[in-house]
Amino acid sequence: MYYPEPITKLIDSFSKLPGIGPKTAARLAFFVLNMKEDDVLNFANALVSAKRELSHCSVCGHITDQDPCAICTDTSRDGSLICVVQDPKDVIAMEKMKEFHGKYHVLHGAISPMDGIGPEDINVPDLINRLKDEEVEELILATNPNIEGEATAMYISRLVKPSGIRTTRIAHGLPVGGDLEYADEVTLSKALEGRRDV
């Protein structure tokens, strides 16, 4: 289909976003064209500002507009407890829960030999250096419950074991309100493994 070049460029730009196909990209492009010019400028400025002003915390790797980030500099948090996550979005999910009061370490990915991603390609070396420099008592591995996340957690736990730091894995299992009959075998197995006393 023919579009004027500015629209084609806009559609191509939206198509680069995850989960956005050509039809959705075209819909978004035409939506933007119908917005007020001030709103479009604010939107464009917000994109540019986020890209320019945000970086990764030099301590934990989380996205921040200050370095070190607000979590790393918060003295009320328990520095002896570090939760290892794959992505900054995982930190946000944990923070919404308002139950974890330790600190974080963001890996920015997971080990995936099939994709050519090894431990050196994610933030594992910085984690190991951090464990040497800080007085950490427990490392909570909160990587995703998929093959890559499990491989990453296993690798880190084996790497950390000689240090004597307690290493735990978050439990995986059934969602609240879920029915057993709809759960797959792996989910049920993980739920059973993660059981606790009541």
UniProtKB/Swiss-Prot annotation:
DNA damage recorded as keyword: yes
Zinc finger (C4-type): 57-72
Pfam family, one: RecR_C
InterPro entries in alphabetical order: DNA_Rcmb_RecR (IPR000093), Rcmb_RecR (IPR023627), Rcmb_RecR_Znf (IPR015967), TOPRIM_dom (IPR006171), TOPRIM_RecR (IPR034137)
Organism this protein belongs to: Oceanobacillus iheyensis (strain DSM 14371 / CIP 107618 / JCM 11309 / KCTC 3954 / HTE831)
One example GO MF annotation: DNA binding
Residue span(s) of domain Toprim: 80-175
SUPFAM superfamilies linked: Recombination protein RecR
Superkingdom to which the source organism belongs: Bacteria
Matching Gene3D superfamilies: 3.30.60.80, 3.40.1360.10, 6.10.250.240, RecR Domain 1
Role noted for this protein: May play a role in DNA repair. It seems to be involved in an RecBC-independent recombinational process of DNA repair. It may act with RecF and RecO.
NCBIfam families to which the protein is assigned, alphabetical: recR (TIGR00615)
Family: Belongs to the RecR family.
Gene Ontology biological-process annotations: DNA recombination; DNA repair
The keyword Transport belongs to this UniProt entry's keyword annotation: no
Protein name: Recombination protein RecR
Originating gene: recR
Keywords: DNA damage, DNA recombination, DNA repair, Metal-binding, Zinc, Zinc-finger
